[in-house]
Amino acid sequence: MAQDDPFGTTRALTGRNTHLEPLASEVISVLCERQTTAPSGARQVVVDYLLRAVATRSSFDPTLVMEELRGYRLTIDAIIDLYIPEVATRMGEMWKTSDMDFASVTVGALRLQSLLSEASSNLARVNLSGVNAPFALVVVAEGEQHFLGASVVAAQLRRLGCDVSLSIAEAPKQITNRVLYDQPDMILMSCAQVSGLETVVRNVKKIRSVVDPSPVIALGGAMRGDLDGIRKKTGVDLVTKSAKDVVGFYMKRHKALSRG
């Protein structure tokens, strides 16, 4: 049997819920958008913010952008490893679809580079047990244009306890002279396209012919397909996008040589 509600709460709540439903739906929608992640694992709301920040026509302050990114509770590692590469990839895709012109992409890449420098200044380095800080040379050969990716790798290597030097668009002879002078423990060559593999082959052969023992040589970049076949063709020790893999390979070889 139905009972009277002397306080009229049923009617009041029903009316109030009717007014609140659109607001609640909007809040839920916004929260869902904030939780949306890209295939890389990056949160969409952060990617959208950073893309706007580097693409805006107004001035860009990497310090202020870093503060904003930290407001999203991001670690320095996540900013370097995930968000800067993700936004760089998005800009490349937008250029291919004519949603962003070349000049804007260039400016955006330079801004990401300055943000990377700002983030790298706050990096904490790890100490590799049992060895002095390994020295790594990151090489972007002539004809390659993806300097930002190499800078990200350099930052990751520094975080892993390495001393790092960058070789940007140097001729093969300059690279060889640098290797002879610096004696790096590992060399990371960046290659974005198959047409650049021949340059990698020449550089690897030259380095191995003049340095004994040869440093660990790794190949990274936008490599797809038969990675083991690429490794054999180029003569590198490993093909990987992970700086951690290269350092791990070096450490294993270093320990094996020390025992021998």
Residue spans of the language-model regions?
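Long amphipathic alpha-helical segments
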Residues: M1-A124
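Peripheral docking tails and interdomain loops at the edges
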Residues: M223, L227-G260
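Conserved mid-sequence domains
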Residues: S121-R208, V216
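Short Gly/Pro-enriched loop/turn and capping motifs at secondary-structure junctions
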Residues: Q193-G196, A222-D226
